[in-house]
Design a protein with these regions (language model features):
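Eukaryotic intrinsically disordered and solvent-exposed regulatory patches
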Residues: 73-74, 100-101, 161, 171-173
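A short, Trp-centered hydrophobic/proline-enriched beta-strand micro-motif
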Residues: 38-72, 84-89, 113
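An acidic-aromatic
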Residues: 74-140, 189-198, 203
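Non-transmembrane domains of secretory- and envelope-associated proteins
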Residues: 2-17, 21-49, 128, 134, ...
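N-terminal entry/capping and adjacent linker segments that precede and initiate structured domains
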Residues: 2-4, 12-15, 29, 57-59, ...
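Short beta-strand segments that buttress and anchor functional surface loops
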Residues: 60-66, 87-93, 157-168, 175, ...
Length: 234
């Protein structure tokens, strides 16, 4: 699946975005998915659902679970597919001792990512080594199911897609998107039958309210080349 990597370089904490994007999506190795599975995606039988087109510009929130840490992390997200850039802002939901909060600005046209500590504005500038790949459903994805989330009078219909192919009976990526408007709901990555990364998206609003969020602060003019640690081990 050409380019299922969303933003693959910075730190595991962004998982679905930093390891889960552009050509890697978190160790799952979803690049080069290959031919469409029979009955799925572009090669499906008449009446088989086809991948919808996800919004190109939106803002929302995400909760990311990483198996490696056993933790959930929350962040605000600004996604600009038209200009190939993403901004992720860590959210603090509880007092966690020795936890540093960061802002990440990923500019794929420039091939760089800025990591900015929220408290001090200290900045790191890191080269992005993977090409841009949009957050959407690949055209050769396999349709798995359609169902409703919620209950009577309060439900939304979603479709579930995967990278499963006829040559194997399991998948390493599962994406859930709404039928109406094709909003991302959840993306999950597995390895050796275990979930290694799962991201939930919510509170999505179309458009970018303030495009300046993609402009690094002035402190990034003297950015260091090394990634900063999330904990207090400076």
């Amino acid at each position: 699946m050409s380019g299922r990597a969303r933003l693959g370089v910075a730190r595991e904490a962004l998982g679905a975005w930093l390891l889960g994007g552009l050509c890697f999506w978190a160790l799952g190795g979803l690049c080069g998915l290959g031919a469409t599975a029979p009955g799925a995606g572009a090669g499906g039988a008449p009446g088989t659902p086809r991948p919808c087109q996800a919004p190109q510009q939106w803002e929302g929130r995400q909760v990311l679970y990483r198996q490696s840490s056993g933790r959930n992390s929350r962040a605000l997200l600004s996604y600009d597919g038209l200009n190939q850039r993403v901004r992720v802002l860590d959210e603090r939901k509880a007092l966690i001792p020795c936890k540093r909060l960061f802002e990440y600005i990923l500019l794929y046209k420039d091939g760089v990512m800025f990591q900015i500590e929220q408290a001090t504005k200290q900045c790191s500038k890191i080269t992005l080594t993977e090409p841009w790949d949009p957050l959407d459903i690949p055209q050769n994805a396999t349709f798995e199911d359609q169902y409703s989330i919620g209950g009577p009078q309060e439900q939304i219909t979603v479709q579930e897609w995967s990278d499963r192919k006829s040559a194997r009976s399991y998948e390493t990526w599962i994406g859930i998107y709404t039928v109406k408007d094709c909003y991302p709901v959840q993306e999950t990555f597995t390895k050796n039958y275990s979930v290694i990364l799962s991201t939930r998206f919510f509170d999505i609003q179309l458009g970018i309210k303030d495009p300046s969020v993609f402009i690094p602060p002035s402190t990034c003019q003297a950015a260091q080349p090394e990634r900063m640690s999330e904990d207090c081990s400076w």
